[in-house]
Amino acid sequence: MKISRRDFIKQTAITATASVAGVTLPAGAANFVTDSEVTKLKWSKAPCRFCGTGCGVTVAVKDNKVVATQGDPQAEVNKGLNCVKGYFLSKIMYGQDRLTRPLMRMKNGKYDKNGDFAPVTWDQAFDEMERQFKRVLKEKGPTAVGMFGSGQWTVWEGYAAAKLYKAGFRSNNIDPNARHCMASAAAGFMRTFGMDEPMGCYDDFEAADAFVLWGSNMAEMHPILWTRVTDRRLSHPKTRVVVLSTFTHRCFDLADIGIIFKPQTDLAMLNYIANYIIRNNKVNKDFVNKHTVFKEGVTDIGYGLRPDHPLQKAAKNASDPGAAKVITFDEFAKFVSKYDADYVSKLSAVPKAKLDQLAELYADPNIKVMSLWTMGFNQHTRGTWANNMVYNLHLLTGKIATPGNSPFSLTGQPSACGTAREVGTFSHRLPADMVVTNPKHREEAERIWKLPPGTIPDKPGYDAVLQNRMLKDGKLNAYWVQVNNNMQAAANLMEEGLPGYRNPANFIVVSDAYPTVTALAADLVLPSAMWVEKEGAYGNAERRTQFWHQLVDAPGEARSDLWQLVEFAKRFKVEEVWPPELIAKKPEYKGKTLYDVLYRNGQVDKFPLKDVNAEYHNAEAKAFGFYLQKGLFEEYATFGRGHGHDLAPFDAYHEARGLRWPVVNGKETRWRYREGSDPYVKAGTGFQFYGNPDGKAVIFALPYEPPAESPDKEYPYWLVTGRVLEHWHSGSMTRRVPELYRSFPNAVVFMHPEDAKALGLRRGVEVEVVSRRGRMRSRIETRGRDAPPRGLVFVPWFDASQLINKVTLDATCPISLQTDFKKCAVKIVKV
């Protein structure tokens, strides 16, 4: 039998993907392996600790230690598969440098910011924290305290943190590291649909006819979902895969259409497709007339830089970047008509034929399209626009909220959706899509939390980028970091990150399991419990909430972030944090601590210890004398029930392999906004985008605008940063797994061979990557998995010995306030 080279690549793609993903045993064998009678191990379910896919795993415990993990064959998400990172979950908690005692900078037996780290007791640690926070609150008020949290917080950790800051300290200066990864997606959902998170689910992978990847390397970042794309492509020959990126990566092995485009010009291509749909009379007029409205957004909105930056000073609409006016369909058609094939092809460097092939997939009414994106769209100075504009394509054609027709924002962290977004740990949000700027939303939160009216501030707090700037400027002085490594992850860290941590006026606390770059820059380091060392809940990218029990104890004196938050609340009486006029509205709170008001309020503490499953430990329940996790969850769930964010009762999640909200009458929802699938859609409406008052989604007219920084003669290369399969985020867990470390020990500079040759460089040569902000040393790689075009270099950011974010620019999308890590100008200098 003859087989072409292309067919050979197609057929081997699934094998290669399975190889890098790490396919586990067939279900029957897997069940045998996890049979406690055979293995003499106790096996329990849990979601994976890594990305937002939400794979289910089974965890084996022996002698109070995790000794094995494998893909859960009963999990709908991954059906028994694991990626290579998931295979080594059992090792992430057992690095040799695991933190087991609090560490504080000391000199002569006392705290000193310029001292060396020394072990202290928890009482000593909290004593100093208490002193510093009370000092700052007294001197400057609640705007001078803050917290940087995480999409890796469990649901109840994020909820407890939001309560402590927004209600207890009365400060909205709490933000998650999801600001770096999912803020543009969230803002895009809210602007278009009035509600956050995808309307579809992973079932769409088995129903789509075409997959279009906009800036997403799923083969490495979401490998289990990529196996589903691969399976669909190879099982159904008419299925098409389109991969758009600024450089070639592993997804291109499966692509029917591979498109390399100039950075930022995805905006122009999106408008071209909308124009193509209209010009070729492929608009679903019935759907558009019934279910959409058109708006034109303001332009020239700046780049989220400091106010004195020339680009910010020149921007005409930086003060209100999200403003928009209603327009007609004809006005929208005229707006996108400027984006014709000649203009867009020249701007993007994409051949016209490929643009038309891509556009036809969206335009053809018989092709079900799944659009998929991650950081390529979200880490973008116009990231919110990019999200809005891809929804335009699905709304114009009516290809939305039905099986296989799905604009799908993939998530990078295990609970960026479930905790950062749904719980509302962003500086402007409250639970269930409510916001601090809305008086009715604040009133509802205060009612549920039993707070006096006016407790929650009405202005958004400092977002992630602004927190670093305010630390540097001395306006944010008491700061707590949990479950993230922002000194490695934040852009422009030498100019805007590290100075704030070392500012003598500031006291920085970092809770972590390992001595990360961020921990080493702190004043106090608190040892945290990890993953199954505590009871937890995550919410994944398809709205699936998943629970797990505590399976082992944390080592030494390590404590969960939840325990740390709630225990610290005992240190503050309301008189020390609230003004007298506020307490006068609730005089019964006089003399009580924030712990009493927030966590022993008759709601959070109403579930007794006997409700805890006797088969499992629960360190927090034991410490506080009630089922803390259940109480927090049930109080939190009150926000969403009856409002389109319905969560099932707490105990149901310990039985199920996750449930996709809204969960109404015990039934999960796979497709939102569609009649017959979503219980909130009224009979006879067909579709209802009920997040907006009129029940309609918004189609936005938005232009192409250039990036904040582009290559020039002095800095001739684009720099793109990102991740690799073997490591997750900053590598603080994966680099401590020997097998993963050996597979990709250090970051490299992926570069086109001709660019390297022109500079007199060869593979393996040491170079410096230099920008206007800083420099970083690495080695050139001209082969391998990633192949940049000429004029662009790609550098992963997992390597703590190569801090590429010394170089990046802290420009953001002015609407979402998410950083653009994908576009800045650099030069490459031989060492």
Swiss-Prot record:
Belongs to the prokaryotic molybdopterin-containing oxidoreductase family. NasA/NapA/NarB subfamily. SMART domains: Molybdop_Fe4S4. HAMAP family: Nitrate_reduct_NapA. Substrate binds at residue 797. It catalyses: 2 Fe(II)-[cytochrome] + nitrate + 2 H(+) = 2 Fe(III)-[cytochrome] + nitrite + H2O. Residues 41-97 form the 4Fe-4S Mo/W bis-MGD-type domain. [4Fe-4S] cluster binds at residues 48, 51, 55, 83. Residues 1-29 form the signal peptide. Transmembrane segments: none annotated. This is Periplasmic nitrate reductase. Its cofactor is [4Fe-4S] cluster; Mo-bis(molybdopterin guanine dinucleotide). Binds 1 [4Fe-4S] cluster. Catalytic subunit of the periplasmic nitrate reductase complex NapAB. Receives electrons from NapB and catalyzes the reduction of nitrate to nitrite. Its EC number is 1.9.6.1. Coiled coil: none annotated.
